[in-house]
């Protein structure tokens, strides 16, 4: 009976779960309009809270995300793995866009995903009684990953390096400016890819046999 009475009014909003009506017009659910209040927030997430966790280290030898994909210049983390605040990354992106604004064809590419919800409890709070409320989004970036790429027609090398240095100045950690020809990075080691030939294969076989006989 209550729902039938409410449906008589054209200005009735049925809530978050169902569609809304305004003067007889169907509107999408309210949940699809909310994006967690930040541009880096994921579009869909399974759990609203997560454990603190640790930044993964590529101990298996993965080189994914250590080279440029779309841009001509990039900024790569080289000293340690860091959990970044979404606002820190947003500030760095705004700096890049502001410096590269005079170049019409300039573009900024992001290579990270802020999919870690961080929850915070108030100061001087007793132990227990839940994890705490959602505070901000974060991203776990392991060592050797590319964070930003920039590219475009007419971009000079000096301007690109200046923009990336200014963005790195506002982020924690140490970074290196890379180009397309920069070798991949595994932790703190640069991986130089050499073509495999008969001579290199023989040299590797001799090194392996010498080490096994010495043991």
From Swiss-Prot:
What InterPro entries does the entry give? Ribosomal_uL16 (IPR047873), Ribosomal_uL16_bact-type (IPR000114), Ribosomal_uL16_CS (IPR020798), Ribosomal_uL16_dom (IPR016180), Ribosomal_uL16_sf (IPR036920)
Q: Where is the transit peptide?
A: 1-36
> GO molecular function: any one?
structural constituent of ribosome
Question: From what superkingdom does this record's organism come?
Answer: Eukaryota
Output the PROSITE patterns linked to this UniProt entry: RIBOSOMAL_L16_2
State the coiled-coil residue ranges: none
Instruction: For this UniProt record, give its keywords in alphabetical order, as a comma-separated list.
Output: Mitochondrion, Ribonucleoprotein, Ribosomal protein, Transit peptide
Which GO cellular component terms, listed alphabetically, does the Swiss-Prot or TrEMBL entry include? cytoplasm; mitochondrial large ribosomal subunit
What are the BP-aspect GO terms?
A: mitochondrial translation
Entry's localization field: Mitochondrion
State the protein's purpose: Component of the mitochondrial ribosome (mitoribosome), a dedicated translation machinery responsible for the synthesis of mitochondrial genome-encoded proteins, including at least some of the essential transmembrane subunits of the mitochondrial respiratory chain. The mitoribosomes are attached to the mitochondrial inner membrane and translation products are cotranslationally integrated into the membrane.
Describe, as the record does, how this protein assembles with itself and its partners: Component of the mitochondrial large ribosomal subunit (mt-LSU). Mature yeast 74S mitochondrial ribosomes consist of a small (37S) and a large (54S) subunit. The 37S small subunit contains a 15S ribosomal RNA (15S mt-rRNA) and at least 32 different proteins. The 54S large subunit contains a 21S rRNA (21S mt-rRNA) and at least 45 different proteins.
Q: Which family does it belong to?
A: Belongs to the universal ribosomal protein uL16 family.
Spell out the protein name for this chain. Answer: Large ribosomal subunit protein uL16m
In its UniProt entry, the species of origin is given as Schizosaccharomyces pombe (strain 972 / ATCC 24843) (Fission yeast)
Underlying gene: mrpl16
């Amino acid at each position: 009976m209550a729902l039938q009475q409410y449906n008589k009014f054209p200005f009735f909003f049925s809530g978050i779960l169902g569609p809304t009506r305004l003067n007889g017009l169907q509107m999408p659910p309210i949940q699809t309009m909310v994006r967690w209040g930040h541009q880096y927030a994921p579009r869909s997430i399974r759990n609203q809270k997560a454990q603190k966790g640790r930044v993964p280290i590529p101990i298996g030898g993965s080189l994914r995300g250590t080279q440029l994909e779309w841009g001509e210049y990039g900024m790569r983390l080289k000293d340690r793995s860091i959990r970044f605040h979404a606002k820190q990354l947003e500030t760095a992106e705004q700096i890049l866009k502001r410096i590269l604004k005079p170049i019409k064809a300039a573009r900024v590419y992001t290579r990270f995903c802020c999919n870690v919800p961080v929850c915070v409890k108030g100061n001087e709070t007793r132990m227990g009684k839940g994890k705490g409320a959602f505070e901000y989004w974060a991203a776990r970036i392991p060592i050797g990953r590319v964070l930003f790429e920039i590219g475009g027609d007419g971009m000079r090398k000096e301007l690109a390096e200046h923009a990336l240095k200014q963005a790195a100045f506002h982020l924690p950690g140490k970074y290196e400016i890379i180009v397309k020809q920069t070798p991949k990075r595994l932790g703190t080691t640069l991986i130089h890819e050499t073509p495999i030939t008969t001579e290199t294969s023989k040299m590797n076989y001799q090194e392996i046999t010498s080490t096994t006989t010495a043991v």
